[in-house]
Structure formats: C-alpha cells, structure tokens
C-alpha cells in the first residue's frame, strides 16, 4: 500500500514541474512582478516572510494583510483579465479568456470555471486594482524572449493574486497558455479553495465536527450553515435546507468509511458500488424503494495528492431512484492506514436550474480540511492545498 501511494504521489507532484515555450529557459521568481511598481515597497516585508514560510503558522502570517491594505473586491472565482490594444487585436486576450471560461467539470448545465471581465491596460484604475484575481498580459519582443507565468500576493488588496503572463509575441503567448491551460485554471482554483479554507478556519460547524470526531476519530471543518447533523453506522451527514430567491437549495456534506482492501479499491466500478450502497442505506428518497444513487456515465475520476498523501477525487452527478431529483457531487477518498479503511468526504447539492459552481466549490474546500486520525497528532499540519507553480522548463 505504501509503495502504491508513494508512486502515485511522486507522479502527481510532478504537476509543479515548470513549463515554458520560447527561446531558452530561465527560472522564475513568483514575487518579481511587483519589482517596477510602487506596490513593491508596500509588500516587500510580506514577500520576505512568505519565502521563509515552512509551517502552518508562517503560512498564516503570509496571508495576513496589513491594517493599511484594503479588502479585495469581487466574488470568488471572478477574474479581471488585462491586456493592451494589440493583445485584443491579435487574439491573445481571447485565447486566455476561452481557457478561463471553459466549462466546470461535474455539473450538468454549462457553467464557466471563472467569471471573467476583460479590460484594456489603460483602464486598470485604482478601483479595479482591488479585484481579487488579476491577470495581466505582457507581450513585448524587445523585453521578453521566454513565455513565463509569474504572480504576487496582496499587491493592492487582500486576499489577492496579481499574475502576469509574459511572452515574446502573440504566437508564443498563445502556445504557452494553451499548453498550460489546465495548470493556469488550477492555480486560481486552488487559490480560491485555500481562501475558503481560511474562512472555515475561523468559522465552522461545531456539531458536524464533533460527530466526525466521535464516529471516525477524525476532524473536519464544514460551513456553519450545515446545522442539521445526522449520524449512522460509519456515517455522518451535515445538511442545510433553505430557499434562495424563492428557489429550494440543499447543501450537504457526508463522511463515511469502508474497509480498505487493495489498490483495486480505487476503481470507478468499486467507487460507484460502495457509494451507492452507503447512500441507499443512509439517504432515502421520498417513498419506499427510492434512494440516492450515482448517475452512470458522468463520473470524472482523478488521482490527486492531498496533504502529501494519495486521494481519489470524483466529480459527478447523482439522482434519486424512480424520482425526479438530482444534482452534482464531489467526493474525496483517502486511506486511513492506521485503521485500514477508506474515509470518504463528499459534498452534494440540490439547486435545480440554477448555477451551482460557487456553492459546490465552497463545499469542496471543506472536504480538504478532513484530518485523519494519524494527522490529528501531528504538531504541524497545513490545511492548505499545494499551489501550482508555472515557470519555464529546460
């Protein structure tokens, strides 16, 4: 088992390998972008601390904004895309825009990964600089020979990411962003997930947390509104039922476990079998013979690294047998080696005919806060997801 996890982790951690296109290769420094702006003076001390961050306490200090730093503007998963007139004319802006607005996986209706606004470089006013996620296109044949992604934190506001993508010309820019489209979108997705984890750190549902401790000897932070907690055999369910603009919305997080057998545990067939059996026993539908089940043919399964360990992440759709009801779910399965079991944290929503991206992402962040029994004893434990690093390759 340990050899399997180690092998997968080594493969997946390679996502941080640097990539680029163009003439030559250079190593990037994520904090260099503010070097020619007045923001450098305001953020230099924070940047220095960030480079020394090696544990949870220092990471928290890195994210703490100065009393003089304004709060960032905009909602989660909103991005401001900035380009020059030539960047609009050559299609460089459109290329990146199309990547950022690609469909979010695991949702029945078409919803973009991000809500993106596009402006000309000259329109980047003091007000717009407060946006939480900013990407600036810099194409200059006289200044750049290599395509590169760089970013700085909390330049004009907090929390904030100000990223730049530089290139020699439009062709090199397009080639770079298309080759690294998944890494670029994942970079900003993880930034937003980590921001939500920071919110959960300060405010989470105590009853769900206590139920997970008693049932599994584990820990989890879920949104405080999930205040209806139901427990069963190796099963805990936190839920929230409410109306948003007169439309019914249900938010749910469940934690359940089953014995770990071998690496074949993490096949799609076995996942669906175990999930359906757990849901049938614990989440009945309205009437006899009705229960939650996994919608076949829509599962997107990926092998990930969560807290330095292997995790199976599944995004898909659920429905109720013989009943017109369904929605989206995301599950994160991890191995509790101490107790030789698989512990699954899953979020699912019911919000018919309305956008689900933001609520599903909010619940997804909570899934990554799950601490297994072995992790509770760690003196230092980081809840944050590892960042995606995009810099030139050899």
Describe every region a protein language model picked out:
Residues 160-169, 253-257, 341-350:
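Short, well-ordered beta-strand elements
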Residues 58-75, 80-86, 223-283:
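Secretory pathway targeting signatures of secreted, lumenal, and periplasmic proteins
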């Amino acid at each position: 088992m340990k050899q399997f996890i180690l092998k997968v982790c080594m493969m997946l951690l390679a996502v941080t390998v640097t990539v680029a296109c163009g003439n030559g290769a250079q190593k990037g420094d994520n904090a260099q972008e503010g070097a020619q702006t007045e923001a450098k003076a305001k953020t230099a001390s924070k940047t220095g601390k960030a480079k020394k961050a090696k544990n949870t306490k220092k990471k928290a200090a890195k994210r703490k904004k100065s009393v003089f730093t304004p709060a960032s503007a905009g909602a989660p998963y909103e991005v401001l895309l900035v380009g020059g007139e030539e960047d609009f004319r050559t299609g460089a802006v459109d290329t990146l825009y199309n990547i950022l607005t690609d469909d979010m996986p695991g949702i029945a209706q078409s919803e973009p990964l991000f809500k993106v606004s596009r402006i000309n470089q000259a329109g980047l006013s003091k007000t717009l600089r407060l946006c939480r996620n900013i990407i600036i296109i810099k194409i200059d044949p006289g200044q750049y020979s290599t395509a590169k992604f760089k970013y700085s934190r909390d330049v004009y506001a907090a929390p904030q990411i100000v990223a730049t993508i530089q290139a020699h010309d439009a062709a090199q820019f397009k080639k770079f962003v298309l080759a690294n489209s998944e890494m670029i979108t994942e970079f900003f997705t993880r930034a937003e997930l980590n921001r939500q984890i920071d919110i959960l750190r300060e405010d989470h549902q105590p009853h769900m947390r206590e139920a997970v401790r008693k049932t599994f000897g584990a820990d989890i932070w879920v949104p405080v509104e999930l205040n209806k907690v139901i427990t069963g055999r190796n099963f805990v369910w936190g839920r929230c039922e409410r109306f948003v603009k007169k439309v019914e919305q249900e938010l749910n997080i469940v934690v359940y476990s089953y014995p770990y057998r071998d690496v074949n545990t993490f096949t799609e067939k076995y996942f669906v079998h175990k999930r359906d059996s757990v849901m049938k026993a614990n989440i009945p539908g309205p009437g006899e013979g009705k229960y939650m089940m996994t919608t076949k043919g829509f599962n997107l399964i990926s092998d990930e690294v969560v807290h330095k360990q292997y995790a199976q992440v599944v995004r898909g759709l659920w429905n109720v047998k013989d009943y017109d009801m369904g929605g989206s779910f995301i599950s994160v399965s991890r191995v509790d080696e101490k107790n030789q079991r698989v512990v699954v944290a899953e979020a699912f929503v019911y919000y018919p005919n309305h956008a689900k991206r933001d609520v599903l992402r909010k619940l997804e962040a909570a899934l990554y806060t799950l601490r297994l029994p072995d992790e509770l004893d760690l003196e230092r434990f980081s809840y944050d997801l590892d960042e995606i690093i995009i810099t030139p390759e050899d």
